[in-house]
Amino acid sequence: MKMKKCPKCGKYTLKDFCSECNEKSVTVKPPRFSPVDKYGKYRRALKKAKM
């Protein structure tokens, strides 16, 4: 599952189509690497919740 962005309204989603404007969403570039992981605890919590 990859994060996607609607090119029309700019909203982020995990779905193939935007829930706001029903436009096909596209895959976004990965965030820049940083040794200080500000959002690591959120990613790990999301991954743990899916298991």
Curated annotation (Swiss-Prot):
GO molecular function: snoRNA binding
Keywords: Ribonucleoprotein, Ribosome biogenesis, rRNA processing
GO cellular component: ribonucleoprotein complex
Domain of life of the organism encoding this protein: Archaea
GO biological process: pseudouridine synthesis; rRNA processing
InterPro entries linked: H/ACA_rnp_Nop10, H/ACA_rnp_Nop10_sf, Nop10_arc-typ
Role description: Involved in ribosome biogenesis; more specifically in 18S rRNA pseudouridylation and in cleavage of pre-rRNA.
Family to which this protein belongs: Belongs to the NOP10 family.
Protein name in UniProt: Ribosome biogenesis protein Nop10
Originating species: Methanococcus maripaludis (strain DSM 14266 / JCM 13030 / NBRC 101832 / S2 / LL)
Gene name of this polypeptide: nop10
